[in-house]
Amino acid sequence: MAKQIEFNDAARKSLEAGVDRLANAVKVTLGPRGRNVVLDKKWGAPTITNDGVTIAREIELDDPYENLGAQLAKEVATKTNDVAGDGTTTATVLAQALVKEGLRNVAAGAAPSALKHGIEVSVEAIAGRLLENTREVAGGQVASVAAISAQSPEIGELLAEAFDKVGKDGVITIEESSSMVTELVLTEGMQFDKGYLSPHFVTDHERQEAVLEDALILINQGKISSIQEFLPLLEKTLKASKPLFIIAEDVDGEALSTLIVNRLRGNLNVVAVKAPGFGDRRKAMLQDIAILTGAQVVSPEIGLSLDQVGLEVLGTARRITVTKDNTTIVDGAGTDADVADRVSQLRAELERTDSDWDKEKLQERLAKLAGGIGVIKVGAATEVELKEKKHRIEDAVSSTRAALEEGIVAGGGSALVQAAKALDENAEVKALEGDAVTAVNLVRRAVAQPLRWIAENAGHDGYLVISKVAELPDGHGFNAATGEYGDLIAQGVIDPVKVTRSALRNAASIAALVLTTEALVVEKPEEDESDSHAGHQH
């Protein structure tokens, strides 16, 4: 396949244009007065959202060079979403500002490598200051963090209640409700850190997860490689017309191939995952899952082999969600008495053990068995509203978890503007020379852009707001919802510091790559067959 190459300024301008087009679509959603973006879907109703990463994922540009820039900006949003679960719009706006300011300096003759070094040192200084300004989350602030992310005080209260019930490490899942009411339901369930063995098992491609409703559960202690030993049970499962969830030491070879083929042909909705843990701990965790789901572990140790067992060894659960990293089982069919017995047994083991490591692992297993799962059932009048609301609640869950992990800073873009004061005080920043000093001022201007767009989207003069906020004490800033200045933390306008730091670092990482790019290589578009025969007489 022939390639096209673009060099120097032309290459960097194309990247900038691509970053701009994506960022301009995303930044209109920033802040409490941000607008929505409507995404066309090939089938079904369009999606209305204000979630940066959801918008970014949909964008592909015609121009192959510009598209490279858009994909880099998309990477900023995706990476921030993976680490912090929110802050994707802020990250995109920061990346756009750093790229724009940086390329202006490169065009004026600044050395890209010096700018890159200056950006990295400056960003670390600001990230460090953000950590210094962090406050721990107090009781009522959980609702504030969630409410800001979801743009709804009611959802904020609901999530505060959910985290209160399941704890900061507890599992919260989001489901669609058949009614118009959004409610919290506490249920028995478990999550463990193993994902699907093949992406072919995915049922929801937008969210890259496999969801099984009312599924049968096979728990096998050993490997499943041969289809022969597995076939009798597979045929019985097919007759039961229910989805099948398999947990085993591993599933590979022809067994995995057969499952994938049946899944792709639509014969059987199936997902396979590796068993969590190692050695004796793995056996114990499989037994925990078996008790929770009413299954029996298939193991030669107790005289059971795959080719001899029937549906009676399978457990069931109302819903199982599997991502590439995690599995969540909700409402297993195990009896309350069996689960309570297992919990008592684990507590007794916990009291007997002296090993810190064993204690930690037993605590984890206890939390999984006894902690339960908070299920938020999302209700809305239409399917379009339901999807939009679900996106907001997902963001809010991630944001709240991030706040509970690392603490909070003032929201509304103010924390970044005030943390930029570190650029005047940090020893490493002061030691910079030449074009690296230019990068310091470039970063100072760039970190003010989220505040600018939050203000502009609310109908205020962004640059005027920036100059006022820069003079206010830490923790004070501009509340775009009311249009007033004040103590943002007291007013509940707060952001998780993890979200703000991740957004800044990821934006700087991509901006540094763009500034030091000298050539772009893309595939040459194929000529249309009808064009190549144009003018020929037949």
UniProtKB/Swiss-Prot annotation:
Reaction(s) catalysed (UniProt annotation): ATP + H2O + a folded polypeptide = ADP + phosphate + an unfolded polypeptide
Keywords from the UniProt entry: ATP-binding, Chaperone, Cytoplasm, Isomerase, Nucleotide-binding
One CC-aspect GO term: cytoplasm
Pfam families named in the record: Cpn60_TCP1
EC number: 5.6.1.7
CDD domains recorded: GroEL
UniProt KW Isomerase keyword: yes
GO molecular function, one term: unfolded protein binding
Claim: ATP-binding is one of the keywords in the record: yes
List of residues binding ATP: T29, L30, G31, P32, D86, G87, T88, T89, T90, G412, N479, A480, A481, D495
One of the GO BP terms on file: protein refolding
Record's subunit section: Forms a cylinder of 14 subunits composed of two heptameric rings stacked back-to-back. Interacts with the co-chaperonin GroES.
Function according to Swiss-Prot or TrEMBL: Together with its co-chaperonin GroES, plays an essential role in assisting protein folding. The GroEL-GroES system forms a nano-cage that allows encapsulation of the non-native substrate proteins and provides a physical environment optimized to promote and accelerate protein folding.
Family: Belongs to the chaperonin (HSP60) family.
Name of the protein in question: Chaperonin GroEL 2
